């Protein structure tokens, strides 16, 4: 596999990326959160995902955790998810207990588009994993995403998180 793309392999290795040998034996490499493959027979319904292990935080004070989750809710990289999660966090984060904060933290470690599709109940595009099937937090996010008040979504002012 490394002989197929020697210059690319060296470049990606220098940047900390890994070339992964998929089940088909094709070369794959990451550019952000999207994967590219050398296999010309890839089907659109076959998704190769990147999984980066989240940083293990131990004994993180709740005020620091809330501040981090606010930041992570507001700065996702995809506008739709930024707007959805920032509004959700502004409304609910201050009321969450430690267990709910842990669950929300875990949700934020998922891919942006997956979060968006799960929140908008678009399971055909991104199937809901069993891990989230009975999540009260995800159900609350889905309800929030319905925008029953028909408000125009915008990034909440930081004072809304207090």
From Swiss-Prot:
Null mutant phenotype: Respiratory deficient phenotype: viable on glucose medium, but is inviable on non-fermentable carbon sources such as glycerol. Cells lack SDH activity due to a complete loss of FAD cofactor attachment of SDH1.
Keyword list, A-Z: Chaperone, Mitochondrion, Transit peptide
Record bears the keyword Mitochondrion: yes
FT transit peptide: 1-35
A biological-process GO annotation: protein flavinylation
Top-level taxon of origin: Eukaryota
Annotated localization: Mitochondrion matrix
Pfam families assigned to the protein according to its UniProt record, in alphabetical order: Sdh5 (PF03937)
GO CC annotations on file: mitochondrial matrix; mitochondrion
Subunit record text: Interacts with SDH1 within the SDH catalytic dimer.
HAMAP family the UniProt entry points to: SDHAF2
Further details from the record: Present with 1080 molecules/cell in log phase SD medium.
UniProt record similarity statement: Belongs to the SDHAF2 family.
Function summary: Plays an essential role in the assembly of succinate dehydrogenase (SDH), an enzyme complex (also referred to as respiratory complex II) that is a component of both the tricarboxylic acid (TCA) cycle and the mitochondrial electron transport chain, and which couples the oxidation of succinate to fumarate with the reduction of ubiquinone (coenzyme Q) to ubiquinol. Required for flavinylation (covalent attachment of FAD) of the flavoprotein subunit SDH1 of the SDH catalytic dimer.
Name of the protein: Succinate dehydrogenase assembly factor 2, mitochondrial
Organism per entry: Saccharomyces cerevisiae (strain ATCC 204508 / S288c) (Baker's yeast)
UniProt lineage: Eukaryota, Fungi, Dikarya, Ascomycota, Saccharomycotina
């Amino acid at each position: 596999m490394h002989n197929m793309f020697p210059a690319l392999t060296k470049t990606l290795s220098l940047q900390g990326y890994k070339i992964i040998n998929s089940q088909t034996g094709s070369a794959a490499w990451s550019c952000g959160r999207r994967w590219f493959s050398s296999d010309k027979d890839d089907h659109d319904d076959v998704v190769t995902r990147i999984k980066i292990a989240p940083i293990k935080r131990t004994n993180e004070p709740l005020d620091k955790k809330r501040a981090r989750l606010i930041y992570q809710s507001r700065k996702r990289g995809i506008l739709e998810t930024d707007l959805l999660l920032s509004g959700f966090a502004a409304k609910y984060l201050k009321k969450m207990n430690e267990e709910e904060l842990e669950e929300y933290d875990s949700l934020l470690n998922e891919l942006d588009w997956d979060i968006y599709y799960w929140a908008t109940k678009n399971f055909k595009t991104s199937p809901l994993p069993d891990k989230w099937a009975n999540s009260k937090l995800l159900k609350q996010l889905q309800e929030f995403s319905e925008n029953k008040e028909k408000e125009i979504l915008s990034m909440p002012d930081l004072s809304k998180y207090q």
